[in-house]
Amino acid sequence: MEKTQDRDTLSGRMEAEGSLNSEELPPHPQSPPPPPSPRSPTSPVTPELPQPNAPTEVEARQLLVEEWGPLSGKLELPPRISWQLLFLERPLYRNLLSSPNPEGINIYQPAPPTGPTRKPLKELGNFRGWYITTQNLQGPLSWTVKEQCVNLLAKKLWEELLDDEQPDITIMDWFEDSRLDQCVYELHVWLLAADRRTVIAQHHVAPRTNGRGPPGRWIQVSHVFRQYGPGVRFVYFQHKAKNRMEPGGLRRTRVTDSSVSVQLRE
């Protein structure tokens, strides 16, 4: 299931956006791009603060049930996973991406005006966890490509849950209607097996804006992976935002509030 809508639509002003069709989708790659290279730490590790008393196993389960809602009778934890661990790590119903809003932009307001800049993107916010590259296009245009590879087992999800229950994996993103080109944004997501090469499911979309509404509004793109099959261990998230080179520097399309989350099926 996929959805593309702007912020005004979510606020109640139901202005219809142009629907996406197969002609708007970029070609499906034969295989996902290589995973990002490990990043060197840029600062010393901060000592951990003392933690408050953790809930008991029974208390942790009750708190999570209150938070998640009624659980399926089939949901059983393997011996290596405890309710206390799930309460601490919160692998479900939260954003698994690092730095989802690197520039601190509020989607409930129009994108703040900004001119061209010669500063590197990494100097414009906190992009920890993102692997960033540039893809040059014809003329003054280019893509800024940002990627993350989410290790679901490292986030304390477990094989039996992913293979047997196959919880929903929800992707959401917001991009600025920058009007730099007809298509200023692309989203590519792959669900990968343990080898990080075998593709189990994928989603690709390149929405075109219709030119209506004020420039700088935020447009939402979303997709839910359901019943994707067993073996998923990684979510490879990639989005592209278009830039245009001008005399004063690079004018960018901004992206914010990117998310990858996992939910139990209802």
From Swiss-Prot:
Q: What is this protein called?
A: F-box only protein 50
Q: Which residues are modified to Phosphothreonine?
A: 46
Record's compositionally biased regions (Basic and acidic residues): 1-16
Q: Where is the composition biased (Pro residues)?
A: 27-41
Which Pfam families is this protein grouped with?
Answer: FBA
GO annotation, cellular component aspect: cytoplasm
Function description: Promotes cell proliferation.
Question: In this chain, where does the modification Phosphoserine occur?
Answer: 31, 37, 40, 43
Expression (tissue specificity):
Strongly expressed in kidney. Weakly expressed in stomach, colon, duodenum and prostate.
